[in-house]
A protein has these predicted regions:
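Loop-helix junctions at membrane interfaces
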Residues: 1-221
Length: 221
């Protein structure tokens, strides 16, 4: 006997029901197919960069990452991130494969899911998801992993704070740009995923992903 899939939206991910629904996505054949599509698209988009300035470029894969995480949740997102990381290296090896780097792939995907999956997707949530990834994943997690990598593979050369500063500056500069582009992208995609029955925020999707004056000021500042 088939059971009807839950379409509940949650105000936060700190509930058993939220995680029960996230795990249940693994049993949904439609989600399996969608996840395979997202992995394939993410591998392709990793090769695509959008130039902002001669020194700043946006990797287009983060659009696919956010879309997938919003649809299938944190459990699937973590698995897809791990598969994408390994396949990406197999398809296009670049130096030594250092397994801890997979944590940044998984972390970014899970953070997107925690903010966007089974939630009323708003501009604030999109901005917070991007800010959390830039700070906690790209800086606070990436830095010690880089230090570990240098200690093992760079002949004793240390990864210093000075070496991490350009990456920190880049994340600060890219945050407003990435937030705006991701909000616009999800604003287009969310009505489509709603119609396909992949997300359940029907009724407020169109108006929720608009920038208020306060949000514009925050991004500009």
């Amino acid at each position: 006997m088939s059971t009807q899939k839950s379409t509940t939206l949650y105000p936060h991910p700190f509930s058993k029901a939220y995680w029960r629904d996230a795990v249940a996505e693994l049993k949904d054949i439609h989600m399996l197919v969608f996840a395979a599509l997202m992995i394939a698209l993410r591998l392709v988009m990793k090769q695509v960069s959008i130039p902002i300035t001669p020194f700043l470029r946006i990797n287009a894969a983060y659009f696919v990452n956010a879309l997938g995480a919003m649809v299938f949740g944190p459990v699937f997102a973590a698995l897809c991130a791990a598969v994408t990381d390994v396949l990406g290296y197999i398809i296009r090896p670049d130096g030594v494969y250092f397994l801890p780097f997979i944590l940044t792939e998984i972390g970014g995907s899970v953070v997107f899911a925690l903010f966007l999956y089974r939630a009323k997707v708003t501009t604030t949530r999109v901005m917070l998801s991007r800010f959390s990834i830039n700070l906690f994943i790209n800086v606070l997690l990436q830095t010690p992993i880089m230090m570990w990598y240098y200690a093992l593979y760079m002949n004793g050369k240390q990864y210093t704070f000075t070496m991490a500063v350009p990456g920190m500056i880049k994340n600060v500069l890219m945050f407003p740009i990435e937030s705006v582009l991701l909000t616009l992208f999800l604003g287009v995609m969310l009505p489509i995923t709603n119609r396909l029955g992949l997300t359940y925020s029907v009724g407020h999707a169109k108006d929720a992903l608009k920038f208020s004056k306060k949000q514009v000021v925050t991004l500009v500042m």
